[in-house]
């Protein structure tokens, strides 16, 4: 809905520009010298001819003392339409202001005015009921000076400044009091002024709708001299429509700007043949836009919709439209129009354009509310008050951006972690934050995406719309932080298990999470990918049935989930992460390999191990974009798999005949740990490119326990049931750290180490 809000507020800017345009045109016209030729008694006839030449209908003929009615101007508001046979426009229409009349004409005008008033008052009783509103305005039109139009001076060359100042009054804000002197205008002329259409709703009993219209009108300049005429008007309308008890609201915005200028270059007409008399410039701009907002409105909206729905035809503000009486009461309407009126009553609903903008800015319910997220409201004694309604630096404000007004949502870095976001609206919120340049909101959207990276990766509506830099950004933010050694204690006998992390600074073990009962199995394998912990099941239940289920743990949210299962069960397999994929290698009596694509959430078969070799009790690691497999049933063999070429190579493993316990990769080197009952632990190293093995370190201990390894930076942790060793994988002098670390507390089953990046305890998490 942001483009609807831009259209709505853009009309206000258009109206302001129209006002400036017509003001400059009026000043330029006034600076031109006017001819001294005065028009005689044929002024009305020439006015008709000029109106016909310019495409405008001629004004109606009436007595000189009565303001003549002419063609009705189109109205931009479409909220209410009049029924057939009853005009909903202002019956006064364009007014004809005549200048340069003689004293004899003035007397006849006064006399004709009185006769006309008498005729109108007597005929007002016979008006059909469908035009009662028009009858009231016709009776009032007998008054020489309408309530909302000033009376011109008695001098023919009087300045129009007084007229402009009087016409500049707020037509929608109230009624202007008529002058005490009720004399008719003494200088009839040919200048035409279209009065602003003041839409003021009349109360309607039994209506279930609540409508309200505001029209902000400003007459820029009205002037008529002997050689030309200038008229300019600008209307701005805002209509609010809301069904009673319904959450939807409709806003209709209309803007009209019109400038008309007449020029006459012929000072003296010779002959009766038709000739060029002058030029007519007519500029007319009308625009209408409508916006419908869905959602609940705050109680403060009732202050704007307390007026009942308007009843067509709407009455002019000068005839007492705010009164609750009948529109057909001609006598009462005439008395109200003729008597001096005080200031606008409190019940009169009138606003200027500035007040309307300020009211929209102070009422967030009238602004564009992004769906799907909310901002927490500060503690406030008034439960009906909305956040941002107070006078502070955080209140909504209007900013001019590329010529259009936008309402900014206040958001600070402190409130960013409290923003309610989810995967359904995070991309829309990110788009809004980019458009409004809200850094805190943008960071919050990136945070949600990084914390739920797998879900974002599988959603084409989110991940497919992100740029390459944004995809890398949310992944790197997920991997930012401190890496910890995480060990899974899997005890199939007790059908329980848990995760613990090791703090090397304090040399303590801390519990992290519990394993779900479905993930506890014998011969399972674990691995980390994108800072997620994946667990591939082994054999479950009392009968040790092989299972193909795969589970996933998100350490940033603490949520366990189940992903796509394997195509076949693989107890005692090895799980390796390479190039954003998981590889399940071997298993009991298996030489096949499966690859998991996290974006598609699917397992596919990869090229099997060469020579139909079964891999059991083996070890595997990834180094230099290749997978290396050795140990167990693959004694004296080293298999190498290229993910780019999708093929395996077999080669000699080298080293001794001792049993290989583990093999890991650090900084382009492979480290293999062999166990010897009498000598202890021997470490062999080779480069991934040269594949030349040599012994680099030893750890002398009799009867060493079996262990498994995990790499944190350049430290290799060897985690066993009774001890935990640390090996420094230095490129020059690799060695064991002399200090023995604290062992895993009370192990219940098999210990499976891995590495995860964990959030700090004081870091607030976004609610998902």
Curated annotation (Swiss-Prot):
Gene name in the database record: KLHDC7A
Signal peptide bounds: none
Residues annotated with Phosphoserine modification: 77, 356
Skewed-composition ranges (Basic and acidic residues): 104-118
UniProt protein name: Kelch domain-containing protein 7A
GO-annotated cellular components: membrane
Alphabetized Pfam families for the sequence: Kelch_1 (PF01344)
Residues covered by region (Disordered): 35-210, 304-352, 371-395
Positions annotated with a glycan in the UniProt record: 248
InterPro entries: Kelch-typ_b-propeller, Kelch/BTB_domain_protein, Kelch_1
Intervals holding Kelch repeats: 319-365, 483-529, 532-580, 581-623, 626-668
Subcellular location per the Swiss-Prot or TrEMBL entry: Membrane
Membrane topology term: Single-pass membrane protein
Record organism: Pongo abelii (Sumatran orangutan)
């Amino acid at each position: 809905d942001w483009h609807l809000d831009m259209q709505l507020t853009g009309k206000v800017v258009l109206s302001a520009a129209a006002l400036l345009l017509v003001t400059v045109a009026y000043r330029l016209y006034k600076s031109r010298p006017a001819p001294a030729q005065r028009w005689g008694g044929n002024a009305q006839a020439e006015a008709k001819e000029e109106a016909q030449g310019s495409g405008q209908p001629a004004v109606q003929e009436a007595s000189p003392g009565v303001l003549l009615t002419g063609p009705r101007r189109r109205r931009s508001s479409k909220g209410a339409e009049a029924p057939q046979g009853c005009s909903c426009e202002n019956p006064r229409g364009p007014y004809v202001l005549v200048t340069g009349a003689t004293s004899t004409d003035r007397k006849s005008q006064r006399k004709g005015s009185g006769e006309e008033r008498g005729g109108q008052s007597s005929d007002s009783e016979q008006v059909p009921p469908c035009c009662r509103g028009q009858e009231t305005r016709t009776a009032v039109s007998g008054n020489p000076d309408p309530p909302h139009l000033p009376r011109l001076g008695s001098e023919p060359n009087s300045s129009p400044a007084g007229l402009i100042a009087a016409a500049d009054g707020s037509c929608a804000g109230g009624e202007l009091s008529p002058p005490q002197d009720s004399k008719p205008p003494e200088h009839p002329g040919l200048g035409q002024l279209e009065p602003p259409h003041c839409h003021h709703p009349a109360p309607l009993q039994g209506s279930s709708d609540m409508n309200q219209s505001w029209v902000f009108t400003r007459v820029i300049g009205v002037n008529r001299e002997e050689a030309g005429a200038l008229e300019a008007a600008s209307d701005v309308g805002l209509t609010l429509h809301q069904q009673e008890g319904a959450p939807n609201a409709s806003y209709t915005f209309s803007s009209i700007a019109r400038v008309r200028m007449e020029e006459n270059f012929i000072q003296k007409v010779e002959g009766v043949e038709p000739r060029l008399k002058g030029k007519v410039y007519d500029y007319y701009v009308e625009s209408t836009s409508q916006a419908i907002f869905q959602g609940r409105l705050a109680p403060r909206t009732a202050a704007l919709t307390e007026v009942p729905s308007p009843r067509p035809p709407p009455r002019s503000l000068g005839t007492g439209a705010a009164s609750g009486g009948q529109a057909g009461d001609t006598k009462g309407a005439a008395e109200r129009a003729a008597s001096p009126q005080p200031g606008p009553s409190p019940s009169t609903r009138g606003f200027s354009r500035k007040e309307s903008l300020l009211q929209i800015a102070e009422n967030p319910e009238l602004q564009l509310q992004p769906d799907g997220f909310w901002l927490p409201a500060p503690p406030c004694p008034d439960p009906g008050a909305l956040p941002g309604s107070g006078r502070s630096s955080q209140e909504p404000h209007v900013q001019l951006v590329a010529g259009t007004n936008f309402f900014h949502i206040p958001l600070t870095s402190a409130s960013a972690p409290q923003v309610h976001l989810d995967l359904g609206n995070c991309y829309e919120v990110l788009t809004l934050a980019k458009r409004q340049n809200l850094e805190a909101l943008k960071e919050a959207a990136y945070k949600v995406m990084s914390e739920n990276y797998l879900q974002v990766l599988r959603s084409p509506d989110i991940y497919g719309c992100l740029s390459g830099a944004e995809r890398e950004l949310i992944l790197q933010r997920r991997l930012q932080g401190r890496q910890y050694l995480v060990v899974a204690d899997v005890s199939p006998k007790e059908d329980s298990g848990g995760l613990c992390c090791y703090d090397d600074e304090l040399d303590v073990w801390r519990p992290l999470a519990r394993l779900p009962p479905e993930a506890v199995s014998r011969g399972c394998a674990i691995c980390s990918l994108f800072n997620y912990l994946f667990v591939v099941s082994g054999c479950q239940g009392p009968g040790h049935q092989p299972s193909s289920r795969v589970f996933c743990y998100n350490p940033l949210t603490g949520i366990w989930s189940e992903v796509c299962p394997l195509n076949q069960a693989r107890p005692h397999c090895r799980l390796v992460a390479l190039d954003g994929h998981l590889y399940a290698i071997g298993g009991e009596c298996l030489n096949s390999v499966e690859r998991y694509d996290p974006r598609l959430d699917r397992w596919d078969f990869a090229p099997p191990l060469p020579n139909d070799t079964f891999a059991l009790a083996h070890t595997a690691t990834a180094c230099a974009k290749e997978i290396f497999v050795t140990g167990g049933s693959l004694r004296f063999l080293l298999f190498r798999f290229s993910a780019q070429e999708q093929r395996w190579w077999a080669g000699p493993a080298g080293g001794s005949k001792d049993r290989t316990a583990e093999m890991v990769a650090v900084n382009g080197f492979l480290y293999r740990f062999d166990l010897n009952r009498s000598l202890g632990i021997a470490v062999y190293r080779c480069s991934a490119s040269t594949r030349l093995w040599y012994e680099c370190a030893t750890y002398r201990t009799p009867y060493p326990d079996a262990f498994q390894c995990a790499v944190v930076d350049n430290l290799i942790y060897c985690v066993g049931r009774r001890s935990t060793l640390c090996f420094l994988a230095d490129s020059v002098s690799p060695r064991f750290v002399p200090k023995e670390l604290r062992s895993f507390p009370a192990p219940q089953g098999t210990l499976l180490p891995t590495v995860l990046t964990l959030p700090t305890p004081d870091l607030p998490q976004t609610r998902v």
